């Protein structure tokens, strides 16, 4: 019994020694990028009548400040050689403005795009899977609900209403009806779905009916708190990988981080 006890003590001591002498393996954790507080986005109220046509050539648009989308570094965790190749591609930018009147919020976007594509044929599609796409997210801060709205270069559109971030997105993404009165008008500076030429880009106007937003309990007007995000999917035969961009910049690639959306200022 004494010999067995001594043997067990010897084994325990050896295990402790080995554990102390073994190299310490450190798990490399991904650092969360530090982003500044989101800058505000100003929506300018207009008295003039707007005729949406996807051209943005009306003088009323000049009243609104311009915001440029920033490239999303969504591939930074790719293998080094692949990531280096992706970063060689030029960034194709986009710029947006926001105005509103008594009936609609208007989002106007000018998009740089050397290969404009949209392969879907009807509204309420998952355009982010294969088509160039602009997305607008609208969130009334007092509520849990928010909207995700799509505009494509062909004028097709999608609207999704999420009652709350704590619910599964899948059922609402698949079953949401098109928002009544929601309109999209686009023009292409080039040719759609033609990889053999070089396009200049596309322009889009999104018209969001304010009465639909207000029906949830928060009117879209000065004195209320709204937050916004504008995002983009850029598919192209000229790019190594699809490009994403956004405004404002979020700490990670997820368009649904509402706490980081830009506060909306009414002017």
Q: Model features per residue range: what roles?
A:
Residues 3, 19-22:
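Secreted/luminal cysteine- and crosslink-motif detector
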Residues 21-267:
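Structural preference for beta-rich elements and adjacent junctions enriched in aromatics
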Residues 9-19:
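Bacterial N-terminal signal peptides
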Residues 1-11:
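Bacterial N-terminal signal peptides that target proteins for export
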């Amino acid at each position: 019994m004494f010999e067995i006890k001594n043997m067990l003590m010897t084994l325990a001591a050896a295990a402790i020694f080995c554990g102390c002498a073994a190299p310490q393996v450190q798990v490399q954790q991904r650092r969360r990028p530090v982003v500044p507080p989101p800058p505000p986005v100003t929506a300018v109220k207009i008295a003039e009548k707007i005729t949406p046509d996807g051209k943005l050539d009306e003088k009323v648009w000049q009243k609104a400040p311009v915001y440029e989308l920033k490239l999303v570094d969504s591939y930074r965790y790719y293998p080094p050689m692949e990531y280096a190749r992706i970063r060689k591609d030029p960034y194709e930018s986009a710029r947006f403005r926001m105005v509103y009147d008594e009936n609609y919020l208007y989002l106007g976007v000018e998009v740089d795009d050397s290969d404009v594509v949209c392969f879907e044929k009807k509204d309420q599609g998952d355009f982010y899977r294969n088509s160039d796409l602009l997305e607008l997210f609208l969130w009334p801060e007092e509520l849990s609900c928010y909207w995700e709205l799509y505009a494509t270069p062909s004028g097709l559109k999608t609207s999704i209403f999420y009652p709350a971030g704590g619910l599964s997105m899948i059922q609402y993404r698949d079953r949401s009806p098109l928002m009544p009165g929601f309109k999209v008008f686009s023009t292409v500076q080039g040719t759609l779905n033609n990889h053999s030429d070089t396009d200049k880009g596309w322009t889009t106007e999104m018209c969001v009916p304010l009465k639909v937003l207000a029906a949830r309990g928060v009117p879209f007007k000065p004195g209320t708190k709204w937050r916004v995000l504008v995002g983009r999917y850029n598919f192209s035969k000229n790019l190594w990988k699809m490009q994403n961009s956004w405004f404002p910049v979020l700490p990670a690639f997820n368009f649904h981080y509402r706490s980081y959306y830009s506060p909306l200022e009414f002017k």
